[in-house]
Amino acid sequence: MIRLWIHRVKDVMAVSLLFAAVCSLLGVVGVTTLELPVGENVGQWIWLGKSTLFSAACIIITCLLQLVKRDSLKKVMCFFHFSVYVSWSLVLWGSVEAVWGLRQLYGFSASGHSRYALTGSFFNPGPYAGYLAMVLPVCLHLYLRARKERFVRYKIEKVVVAVAGILILCVLPATMSRSAWVAAAVGCGWVAYMHRDKSKWNVLWKRYKRRFILWGVSALFILMLGGAGAFLLKPDSALGRLFLWKITCRAVVNYPSGCDKGFAFAYGEAQEDYFVRGDYEEWEERVAGSPEYVFNEYLSLALTEGVVVCIIVLVAIGTCLWMGAKRGRYGICGAILSLLIFSFSSYPMYFPAFVVAGILLLLACGVGDFIYKPLILCICLILWIGGYTEKWKQEEDACRKWVYAKMFYNSGAYKVANKSYGEIYPVLKEKGAFLFEYGHSLYKSGFYNESNKYLKEACLYSTDPMVLNIIGKNYQELHRY
């Protein structure tokens, strides 16, 4: 009896440690660094490095427990039911984000952006909505699966995921993110379709075929009206993204194997060439800007890494989806579909939270059951031995000093700001906003040649036309027309 009790305690400990190993990685979504410049994610990367070490420690302890229990080598090395751990970790963090958003809506918590009331742990409501949309299909899958079971455990699961889903649905409409709404609808639609009773649907189809066709046509008409309404909700925003994709496609044609100088350089070059030709519409001139992101991860990948790499990644994702569907992991596949749809008109891969979630979801389709334990140990070794954590720490310290230097810059103490900017330049020399501030501060101080040096570097990382304006002013002051 005592041996059985000890055995169960070890099982509970192993399950808890494995859940902590997965949950800690996905916990990067809850990390906020308000002391850093807006939009900087280096604090989340540092957390990821620490959580990877914690995850590796949990896995090692679990393996030792399993060896003590004399489990088979296969059970020790494999991570069985990996998809379950990922699903419940996503439900947990999705619920935390939903509650976070509700607190912001009711004024109990501060938003991450002064212009928006609802951002969750993000600095923009768009990515926040995308994260909630990714979690919602997982909640629906767990609910539909638990609905068919009569055990008390499944009844508790059904209540928990129902509460999580309701919390997300309370917040998601308030984000005003059309991309996230569509992503959530597609992901949940996939899950509901895969959970259908095939025999019952076949009988109903044969009996009410005409009625179903009529309903389908009506639903299509409603979707078209909804699409038109979504467009009219923020028309310039939609037109702006269409123009952004158009110019990015032209840039991809110019750099089919990828542009090593980055998105900003390739996009700025393509947009300049487009307007120089003069063959453009009035609305294109109105919505054109200097974007920081492509708002389409597929075009972004094709532009920066090449079309071939983009195709390889899409094939790999499609293979994982096929494996997940074959294994009945509909919630995981639904979450991936939501992320894929959201990636079509947003920039989720800019955030560590989406990068980690995307990788874990792909692994949860089947491969993770066999390779996750050695994989996380290898990643831990790469991060710590390769010095990535130290690099991220240096960047975080530099960003803190940047905030300090920005105070002098905004107050007009340019000489003091120049000294601070010069100290952190080696670490932040690939950030367009930093280079522009440094160059502009040098311009205000009268160092025109030095200013142009850094502003020309900024052109590689920023499409902001003000960079070129200041370069022109520098040449004007130097009497070089």
Show where each model-derived region lies.
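Interfacial juxtamembrane loops and adjacent helix segments
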Residues: 109-116, 250, 260-303
